[in-house]
Each structure stands twice: as C-alpha cells, then as structure tokens.
Amino acid sequence: MEEEKMSDCIFCKIINKEIPGKIVYEDDECMAFLDLSQATYGHTLVIPKKHYANILEVDDETLAHVMKIVKNLANQIVEKLDAKGVNVLTNTNEVAGQTVHHFHIHILPRYDENELKIEFTDHSNDVDLDEVYKKIKNKKRCENIFLKERKLFK
C-alpha cells in the first residue's frame, strides 16, 4: 500500500524527474522547487528525497538536513527577491491543511503584510495552561532529545 502511495506522489515524481519542476536546489538527501501555486512570489518547497508522509515520520538526521537547507534558501530568497521576511511552515494531516502527503516545508517570502493571512485566534480564556502543560511535558524525553540534537549539530 505504501509503495502504491509513493508511486502516486507528485513530489516523488518530481524527484524522479517523471514530471518537471522548477528545481532551485538539489543534493543527495533533499530537493527544493518552486510551488506551482506561488501563494507569494518565490514560494518554495523543500522536501526530503525519501518519502515520509509528514514531519511526524521523518528521522531526526533528515529533518536536521532539510532545516539547514530551508534556512539557507530562506536567506537567499530574502536577499535575491527583496523579501521583507518569510514564513516557514509545514502542515501535518488534512485537518492542518496538508494536501500532498510527502513531508515538505514551505518557504513563503513576505513583501506586504496583507498578501497572505496566517492568523492565530486567542483562546487563552478557554484553555487551562497548567492542564496542557502537564499533559505534554516530559522532562526525561526532552533531555534525551537535547543530547541527541547536540550530536546532530556538531
């Protein structure tokens, strides 16, 4: 089933050069290309070449590499396209807006504050932060992740 999904994946087809893409960066592990929608001028996607459905599945080493490329490309986009800033984001699952199920990160150059709306609704009066904190805090796991990250970024 997973193999079938990958054969239908538009990003895998771009990686395999089965369909064209405006590729702005490529190495052994990842690729970056212009998003056809161009939500903003220069809208770029960065993807790992290995198929992962979303950020929850990607291994830490691949994620670290992809993020380094995102940072470098975002800087290049700001400089070369005279963007005033960028949004860097990923969507995970349909409820969050994911439409292509191959992990990817959007680099959205920003020129004018009105060209794209990304808004956060304030629910602070409806949420018990202590309750949420207790549910997601895991000190031991965070310590292990920190040690692993220190090794990754050396």
Locate predicted features.
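HIT superfamily nucleotide-processing domains
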Residues: 1-154
